[in-house]
A protein has these predicted regions:
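Bacterial Sec-dependent N-terminal signal peptides
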Residues: 1-23
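N-terminal leader/pro-regions and domain N-caps
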Residues: 22-46
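C-terminal edge strands of extracellular/lumenal beta-sandwich accessory domains
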Residues: 22-31, 54, 82-100, 133-249, ...
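Extracellular beta-rich ligand/substrate-recognition surface
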Residues: 40-51, 196-201
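Extended extracellular/luminal ectodomain segments enriched in beta-structured repeat modules
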Residues: 49, 60-67, 213-219
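Post-signal peptide N-terminal segment of secreted/secretory-pathway proteins
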Residues: 53-56, 60-114
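Alpha-helical transmembrane segments forming the membrane-embedded cores
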Residues: 200-204, 240, 247-282
Length: 319
């Protein structure tokens, strides 16, 4: 297992040298919003634990201050999901230093134990506040070396917690080199081990997630919560034209196992959520593990690029 993790980190450094940090979720993912519900919400609204954890990677060569910007951080107004009346709060907290990203509790599917590991660098709680509705809020500045030094760069952890209330907070994020503008940091990226996001409302729309398959992985298990029978799950890769599985029902988990071929090693998968109904406000939670049960990160910018199926053309030889 250590060999798998070490090789994955090495390939991340090789493949990502020219990446530029993008919005989280990124344009490639075609996800309208990330979401976190407050702790008194019903789970059938689409959040299994009311906490989300995201990681932002800053290259070691970056010497200028960095910022984590959040779009629409309040919980009320234009985009957020109300239950009767808005009465909720959401807390955004940034952590750096030793253990922020490497502590095993920070990488669990369910946030328990010391998932707030590291040093808290910033924290802000939002309620129903028009001053932050449909606007960007900036956390920072942070010196890059305040993150935890990992092989792929300095890593900052952002924890979003649903506090009191029963409403859903929909938001986006950006790792930026400027406080008042979304300017990409060359070589930056972002990832999470569990994705909680809003599906698009339109029938036929497709959302994408991109886990990286490192050497040594023989199978992946894709776990989906509360897809509401809203469509199908399709897996595309350099070797898979589109393996289709059924979606999960309301407020339940569904696990699908997919074998990994040699051609798929050291590439990203394209996990597609294909919407087949014109239904609104469908929020989904997803995580993926390898054959050892280890969580695999989803990268905002797919490692090695968006995977494309490679058609194999057979040649018939006449004797």
């Amino acid at each position: 297992m250590k060999k798998i993790i070490t090789l994955a980190i090495f390939l991340l450094k090789v493949c990502c040298g020219n990446l530029q940090a993008q919005p989280f979720p990124s344009a490639d993912e075609k996800i309208p919003f990330l979401c976190t519900f407050s702790k008194n919400s019903q789970k059938d609204w689409g959040d299994d634990d009311f906490v989300q954890i995201y990681f932002f990677v800053v290259p070691q060569t970056e010497k200028n201050p960095i910022y984590i910007r959040v779009f629409d951080p309040d919980i009320g107004g234009k985009y957020d999901e109300v239950h009767d009346v808005f009465n909720s709060k959401t807390r955004f907290s940034v952590y750096g230093g030793k253990g922020a990203a490497s502590n095993p509790d920070a990488k669990k599917q369910t946030p328990t134990g010391n998932f707030k590991s590291g040093i808290q660098l910033s924290s802000k709680t939002f309620g129903d506040d028009a001053a932050y509705d449909d606007k960007w809020y900036t956390l920072g500045p942070f010196n890059p070396v305040e993150g935890e030094l990992q092989p792929d760069g300095y890593v900052f952890k952002l924890i979003i917690e649903g506090m009191d209330g029963d409403d859903g907070n929909l938001y986006k994020m950006f790792l930026s080199s400027l406080p008042n503008e979304n300017k990409a940091i060359e070589g930056g990226n972002a990832y999470t081990y569990e994705y909680s996001f809003r599906m698009a409302d339109t029938k036929g729309s497709i959302s994408h997630l991109y886990p990286f398959v490192s050497a040594g992985i023989t199978a992946v298990k894709i776990n989906v919560f509360d897809f509401d029978d809203d469509g199908i799950l399709r897996v595309v890769s350099v070797a898979k034209k589109g393996e289709i599985t059924k979606s999960s029902g309301n407020a339940v988990w569904l696990e699908n196992t997919h074998k990994i071929t040699t051609e798929e090693l050291n590439t990203s998968l394209d996990i597609q959520f294909v919407k087949q109904q014109d239904s609104k406000n469908n929020n989904v939670v997803v995580y993926i593990t390898n054959q050892y049960g280890e969580l695999m990160p989803f990268y905002a910018t797919p490692i090695g690029g968006v995977p494309k199926y490679k058609f194999k053309i057979g040649v018939k030889v006449d004797n």
